Curated annotation (Swiss-Prot):
Cellular compartment(s): Cytoplasm
Lineage of the species this protein comes from: Bacteria, Pseudomonadati, Pseudomonadota, Alphaproteobacteria, Rhodobacterales
Organism: Cereibacter sphaeroides (strain ATCC 17025 / ATH 2.4.3) (Rhodobacter sphaeroides)
Catalytic activity: alpha-D-glucose 6-phosphate = beta-D-fructose 6-phosphate
Enzyme Commission number: 5.3.1.9
Function: Catalyzes the reversible isomerization of glucose-6-phosphate to fructose-6-phosphate.
Active site: E341 (proton donor), H372, K501
Pfam families per the UniProt record, alphabetical: PGI
Gene transcribed to yield this protein: pgi
The protein's name: Glucose-6-phosphate isomerase
Length: 533
């Protein structure tokens, strides 16, 4: 692999100053550097990847063993080596085929849990399961990280399909979050879902206790309006939640990959079991494509290779995710966890420090809002920010089709502007037409130059349906896997979240004045004195 990395870097240095626009002298450039899966189009032609770079990147994926590790993942081998676990979130959307874990087929158990979820969601949506004040009108999902970001993102994304109770999400331990969520709800018609695998997550259980106190005095049996997504049956029972409303999942489903199963219960309640199954089917379709398509036509592999080129080869430290769909407003936050928690590592699987940078910083906002915020830096700043646009051909509001067309035109305009830029001569000509002359023209013209040559990709699709969202999310999941394999890291642990948790537990009694601050640095002691009780 070392020779391929070196060849990629040498080639990148050779073409670094070549305008991307020059590559379009090839009339087949767009076609050759775009990939389709049914009605989904991934256009990566507006990058500086040429035929040589593409071939080297594909060789890199082969040398890294992407095929073998992909097959090992789907076969249920313990590719999460630091925790000794299989990685089988894909099984949650492929329950009609054997799923082997340590030689045992667990598919029947997955189907049973899924059927229980369907029955519960159906009964709640149809008014057969009620609150103590009548039909359930609101569902509050209490979780954090993977128990929140996925379903919260998906519920907003699929709002046009949400014909069930209103769904709300509480994650932050900041009391303002749960206060503002519950203040306008009726406890007698609200179901609270507590999503915590161990039922010990501090933020989640603190909010769950607050929600229970909110119900006490207003309903006769608060626990009767709680459900849980957890494997800790003893703790959910101690909380008072009946076993019929407890939905478990296995340790081979990582939190940030878990909304395909019981963590997605709130989504199933919102959009209904049929549309939830369409969401699963979309993910399964991407799984099949990932397993069967050759690398040169494989969307997750190509998306990952573009990411490797931009981050590890070109040195661009960030990646902007720019969905031109307001209902995908939470997608960048979801991908922040998916990508940065998975591939934000400093050591390889063998424990040695990485020779290359690991995953990029992922951020973004929906268009067109971002155009009036941070696109200034993307267009004219001194750092290159690779951009990933997502856009649908059609919206869900036929009477507002003219606005959707304006949205699409803005998306395409931004990718073209990043590619082309505006030269100094073009800026001068524009100012001259406005009557600006002399030194003032020269001064102002320089402020109107766009360097261009900024790389971007576009993922285009007909409409954001449940099945299409499933495809998109599975695409990004597999992209993370491929990048992790190429970098030689474990994408499925998250030890980086542990140290802060441990320190927070020790700091709480210091803030309460019950423990001394010996051993703390001067800054932390000062902050404890200022913020403590």
């Amino acid at each position: 692999m070392k020779q391929i990395w070196q060849a990629l870097k040498a080639h990148q240095q050779a073409v670094e100053h070549r305008p991307i626009l020059d590559l379009f002298a090839d009339p087949r450039r767009a076609e050759s550097f775009s990939t389709r899966l049914d009605d989904m189009l991934f256009d990566w032609s507006k990058t500086n990847i040429d035929h040589t770079a593409r071939d080297l990147l594909i060789d890199l994926a082969g040398a890294a063993g992407v095929s073998q590790k992909r097959d090992a993942m789907f076969a249920g081998r313990k590719i999460n080596e630091t925790e000794g676990r299989a990685v089988l979130h894909t099984a949650l959307r492929n329950m009609d085929r054997p799923v082997l874990v340590e030689g045992q087929d667990v598919a029947a158990g997955l189907r049973e849990t899924h059927a229980r979820m369907q029955a519960f969601a159906h009964d709640l949506r149809e008014g057969l399961f009620t609150g103590q004040g009548g039909r359930i009108t609101d569902v509050v999902n209490i979780g954090i990280g993977g128990s929140d970001l996925g379903p919260a993102m998906a519920c907003l994304a699929l709002a046009p399909y949400a014909d069930g109770p209103r769904c709300h999400f509480v994650s932050n331990v900041d009391g303002a979050h749960i206060h503002d969520t519950l203040k306008d709800l009726d406890p007698a018609t609200t179901l609270v879902i507590v999503a915590s695998k161990t039922f010990t997550t501090i933020e989640t259980m603190t909010n769950a206790e607050t929600a229970r106190r909110w119900m006490e005095g207003r309903v006769a049996n608060p626990a009767a309006q709680f459900a849980a997504v957890s494997t800790a049956a003893d703790r959910t029972a101690a909380f008072g939640i009946d076993a019929s409303r407890v939905f478990g999942f296995e340790d081979w489903v990582g939190g940030r990959y878990s909304m395909w199963g019981p963590i997605g219960l709130s989504l199933m309640i919102a959009i209904g079991p049929e549309d939830f199954d369409a969401f699963l089917s979309g993910g399964a379709a991407m799984d099949r494509h990932f397993r069967e398509a050759p690398f040169a036509e494989n969307l997750p592999v190509l998306l990952a290779l573009v990411g490797i080129w931009h981050n590890q080869i070109c040195g661009h430290a960030t990646r902007a995710v720019l969905p031109y769909d307001q209902r995908l407003a939470r997608l960048p936050a979801y991908l922040q966890q998916l990508e940065m928690e998975s591939n934000g590592k400093r050591v390889a699987m063998d424990g040695h420090e990485l020779a290359l940078h690991s995953g990029p910083i992922v951020w973004g906002e929906p268009g067109t809002n971002g155009q009036h915020a941070f696109y200034q830096l993307i267009h004219q700043g001194t750092r290159v920010v690779p951009c990933e646009f997502l856009v649908a051909r059609d919206g869900h509001e036929p009477d507002l089709a003219h606005q959707h067309l304006l949205l699409v035109s803005n998306c395409l305009a931004q990718s073209e502007a990043l590619l082309r830029g505006r030269s100094l001569d073009e800026a001068r000509a524009i100012l001259a037409k406005k009557g600006v002359t002399g030194t003032e023209l020269e001064r102002q013209a320089r402020h109107r130059v766009f360097p261009g040559n900024r790389p971007s990709t576009t993922l285009a699709y007909p409409k954001l349906t449940p099945a299409m969202l499933g495809r998109i999310i599975a695409l990004y999941e597999h992209r993370v896997f491929v990048e992790g394999v190429i970098l030689g890291i474990n994408s499925y642990d998250q030890w980086g979240v542990e140290l802060g948790k441990e320190l927070a537990i020790a700091l709480q009694p210091m803030l309460e004045g019950r423990a001394g601050t010996e051993g703390k640095d001067g800054s932390t002691r000062q902050l404890i004195d200022f913020l403590g009780r």
